Regions:
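N-terminal helical cap/lid subdomain that shapes the substrate entry/recognition surface
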Residues: 2-98, 105-106, 119, 130
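Asp-based, Mg2+/Mn2+-dependent phosphohydrolase catalytic module
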Residues: 2-9, 43, 104, 118, ...
Length: 225
């Protein structure tokens, strides 16, 4: 791992900062039932989430019912349910708040770049991480491309123009996140506690593969010495 000073960490949200899988699965199964479709098992959702809610719906729906109209119908049931129940079982992963505390105390800036819809992203950050001064909280928005398109990371970096690209790292739990960082030209951190596998992350040669949040702290703070 090459030493480089880090001043901004851009985080993915689901599977990286927060364990959201149970609430996402419950909301999607609620929508499937409302649409007259069979539900999915919880573990199936680990591979379905992470590419925006429309792709979540397409993946969860039976193959013969993946029309645009059905995706719209799924959204109409999913959003009200998830907005009400998004914090029922969702929690920060162990060690996340301690990591953020240590990094913030060292002067590291934070941003979030997620494929979760914007209102949902903002609500969860406010609920669980409201005390931290995120420079940007960015989710999926109408007319904006989703990850792995790098635009969302570039937009987050534009919020702190005094920080160079070489001082930025993007942190996530999936191949989509690793590709997003690569496409944006920044270093990547893959986290093994999220929704995807170590092998999926290692295939994209992350700057750091972290087994726990403490390892992120150690790597970032060591490079400041």
């Amino acid at each position: 791992m090459v030493k480089k000073m880090t001043r901004l960490i851009i985080f993915d949200l689901d599977g990286t900062l927060l364990d959201t899988i149970d609430d996402l699965a419950a909301a999607c199964n609620h929508a499937l039932t409302a649409c007259g479709c069979p539900t999915r098992e919880r573990d199936e959702y680990f591979m379905l989430v992470g590419r925006g809610i429309d792709n979540l719906f397409r993946g969860a729906l039976p193959e013969d019912r993946r029309s645009s109209a059905m995706v719209d119908r799924m959204r109409s049931f999913f959003l009200p349910y998830y907005n009400e129940h998004s914090c029922d079982l969702t929690r920060p992963y162990e060690g996340i708040t301690e990591m953020l505390d240590r990094l913030e105390a060292a002067g590291i800036r934070f941003a979030v770049a997620s494929n979760k819809y914007q209102a949902g992203t903002e609500a969860l950050i406010d609920r669980f991480f409201g005390k931290y001064g995120f420079v940007s909280i960015l989710g999926q928005r109408e007319g904006k491309p989703i990850k792995p398109d790098p635009q969302i990371v570039i937009e987050a970096m534009e919020g702190v123009p005094e920080i160079s690209k070489e001082e930025v790292v993007y942190c996530g739990d999936s191949d989509v996140d690793m590709l997003t960082g690569i496409n944006a030209g920044v270093r990547t951190i893959g986290v093994t506690w999220g929704f995807r596998t170590r092998d999926e992350l290692l295939a994209h040669n992350p700057w750091l593969l972290a087994e726990n949040p403490g390892e992120i702290c150690e790597a970032i703070l060591q490079d400041m010495k």
